[in-house]
From Swiss-Prot:
Protein name in UniProt: Cyclin-P1-1
The gene coding this protein: CYCP1-1
UniProt entry keywords in alphabetical sequence: Cell cycle, Cell division, Cyclin
Domain of life: Eukaryota
GO annotation (BP), single: cell division
Stretch list, region Disordered: 1-25
Keyword Cell division part of the UniProt annotation: yes
Protein family membership: Belongs to the cyclin family. Cyclin U/P subfamily.
Listed GO MF terms: protein kinase binding
PANTHER family xrefs: CYCLIN-U1-1, PTHR15615
Keyword Repressor: no
């Protein structure tokens, strides 16, 4: 009965969050991602689409719109607001999702985050962030309806993101704070309300502690429940990978460059 009461309380909280104005984290992430997309779109336009062609098949193909299909007309901010309106995610989910976008961009530098893939990438990042941070979260079918994709595609997007990130989805408190401070600085530069996130450090610390407790194998179990196929190469992942990721910032095993945009 305690579990049922907790689930009911969490659902009530999510409904209240969804009916509230978007959190400042959402606006900050939207600004930062829009700037990244605008820059990459401009680079691809100048290169005659060569960068876009190189991105396909470089590990992020699942996030690409169908070949020749136009990019979604809805803007990044409006898309995130739609997710907020229906899903009622924790504010920290947006910061963690932005971290995943940055990490994915570093892992697959040939596949630029651009207008043709940003919506699907953000949707997958928010889905995984909610599973990591929230005790009770919406399933893949719900996120698929909110994000405008099929359930099968949502499953593929989730597994594609987890593959790109090597299931390293736990952020240390230090890394979380670096991303949050980066978003605040970008918002202040744009004249936004960067200081609105002041005082969130205590909540961020609690969230960082909970991130370390979620193992890749647990995420695989959740993916299986939601109807996603498991890749044989990922079944060997376990708590050792989770503990390694939770220890803090480290270099990616297959690259000599940092996993993040920050010198930690």
């Amino acid at each position: 009965m305690d579990a049922a009461a907790a689930a009911g309380g969490e659902m009530s909280r999510q409904k209240a969050t969804a009916s509230a104005p978007p959190p400042p984290e959402l606006d900050m992430v939207a600004r930062a991602v829009q700037r990244l997309v605008a820059r990459n779109d401009a680079v691809e336009a100048l290169s005659g689409g060569g960068e876009a062609a190189a991105g396909l098949g470089a590990g992020m193909a699942a996030f690409e719109a169908a070949r020749g299909a136009p990019a979604p007309r809805i803007g990044v901010a409006q898309y995130l607001e739609r997710v907020h309106r229906y899903a009622g995610l924790e504010p920290e989910c947006y910061v963690v999702a932005y971290a995943y976008v940055d990490m994915a961009a570093h892992r697959r530098p040939a596949a630029a985050v651009a207008s043709r893939n940003v919506h699907r990438l953000l949707l997958a990042c928010l889905l995984v962030a909610s599973k990591v941070l929230d005790d009770f979260h919406h399933n893949n079918a719900f996120f698929a309806r909110v994000g405008g994709v099929s359930n099968a595609e949502m499953n593929r997007l989730e597994l594609e993101l987890l593959a790109v990130l090597d299931f390293e989805v736990m952020l240390s408190h230090r890394v979380y704070e670096l991303y949050r401070e980066h978003l605040e600085k970008e918002a202040r530069r744009d004249g936004g309300g960067g200081d609105m996130l002041a005082g969130a450090s205590a909540a961020a610390a609690a969230k960082a502690g909970r991130m370390a407790a979620v193992s890749p194998s647990k995420l695989l179990e959740r993916a299986a429940v939601n109807g996603a196929a498991q890749h044989d190469d990922w079944r060997s992942l376990g708590t050792a990978a989770a503990a390694e990721a939770a220890n803090g910032v480290r270099r990616h095993r297959s690259s000599s460059s940092s996993r993040y945009s920050f010198d930690c």
